[in-house]
Amino acid sequence: MSDNEGSVPTEGIDYGDTMVVWPSTGRIPGGDVKPGGSSGLAPSMPPGWGDYSPQGIALVQSVLFPGIIRRIILDKELEEGDWSGWSVSVHSPWGNEKVSAARTVLENGLRGGLPEPSRPAAVSFARLEPASGNEQKIIRLMVTQQLEQVTDIPASQLPAAGNNVPVKYRLTDLMQNGTQYMAIIGGIPMTVPVVDAVPVPDRSRPGTNIKDVYSAPVSPNLPDLVLSVGQMNTPVRSNPEIQEDGVISETGNYVEAGYTMSSNNHDVIVRFPEGSGVSPLYISAVEILDSNSLSQRQEAENNAKDDFRVKKEQENDEKTVLTKTSEVIISVGDKVGEYLGDKYKALSREIAENINNFQGKTIRSYDDAMSSINKLMANPSLKINATDKEAIVNAWKAFNAEDMGNKFAALGKTFKAADYAIKANNIREKSIEGYQTGNWGPLMLEVESWVISGMASAVALSLFSLTLGSALIAFGLSATVVGFVGVVIAGAIGAFIDDKFVDELNHKIIK
């Protein structure tokens, strides 16, 4: 080596029993490399974005420390043939990382409850500047955590690859006011897939693997990540601040996680082969968005937030009407029970309890409901004379169903009064038809039509039950007639919930 050659500083990476070095001014791993430049390129390997070691893998682009964001770049313009994979060296924990500080804020916040009970809480630890949008470069920010930092599941109990493992925390991206952030989230049940790392073959020595080097898929449709893990258990001697371009480290506030969280990141738990002595790693890979993508993501965030708000209001409205309806059915039970006894009161309370807990459930089909109603009407003990039948019809005709529909609609912010007034009046008219002709099909079909047209089953059951129950309470009929109508109402409502209610009416109440 000449004096000039000896004066050239070098950099390198240790792949176990092989050290690959390169001139520090010739290129930087992961940077803009030109084919044919200075490198440790093996003669049999094509030029590429990071060049290759003699064993046939790309030289390490970056060093991953738990909790510290690193930028990994794949330059497609320089890569020839199949991608060999992202290549990183994994080290032991290094200080000056921001995830721990964000986790502390998150844990303190969770002690006081979630900002929104149905969604995870989040604390950001980095703000991301927009990407340049270079289509020839695939860029991912990667950040790792040790297994015990994200889950209580020990390494020995991790499921097979392809299955998910429950985690307490995830590192993900989210949107706030047009800006992309990296954040730690938690507070609700979450899962992350498990992937298996496999040894990387040594191309310079066929039939052998490179010591302490593995590959694993961490992001769909992208090359596997090549991990050099020989330094994982070696303490870091210095503790400088690491700052990537476009990544501004800062600890945010305790907030509700975004509605499009994780839209541009993938996270996995990487398990290494048994006997490797390497502990599993949690890795999150995040795509940095350019300005146009940021605008689209923020629009999607706003739309998702609006959809969530509307859904939340609808759920609150459903719960309100279910509660109100169950109260009315209990009142019906008390009134009719004065004639039919405690068994009817108990049945009414059971129906009311089912109604109160009907949110998220589906009413029985028209055919099933009609099967139950027909069993009830076939009971020879359920008879009424013409005079009493006329009294029931007249009572229904006098009932202001439209007013009842308006009052029902007033219970919910998302209900339209006109729609419910019409539907309540339809219940009135088809109930009259049922009493006059004995044909209850139109009444039951009316309710099913609401659900088919998009009404939630909980709302449909509530409107149907509330209309029938309110009418009975308003009727000024004799005790005998009230008992008959009470059985019909309990049977009609119960038929949409469970066939057992008609069976109880037939065998325990009708005499």
From Swiss-Prot:
A GO term from the CC aspect: plasma membrane
Primary subcellular site in the record, as a coarse category: membrane
UniProt topology in membrane: Multi-pass membrane protein
GO biological process: defense response to Gram-negative bacterium; killing of cells of another organism
UniProt-recorded Gene Ontology molecular function terms: pore-forming activity
Alphabetically ordered keywords of this record: Antibiotic, Antimicrobial, Bacteriocin, Cell membrane, Membrane, Plasmid, TonB box, Transmembrane, Transmembrane helix
UniProt subcellular location: Cell membrane
Record field: transmembrane: 455-475, 477-497
Motif (TonB box): 17-24
Keyword Cell membrane: yes
Pfam families for the chain: Cloacin, Colicin
Function, in words: This colicin is a channel-forming colicin. This class of transmembrane toxins depolarize the cytoplasmic membrane, leading to dissipation of cellular energy.
Additional facts recorded: This colicin requires TonB for its uptake.
Name of the protein in its database record: Colicin-B
Species this chain originates from: Escherichia coli
Designated gene of the protein: cba
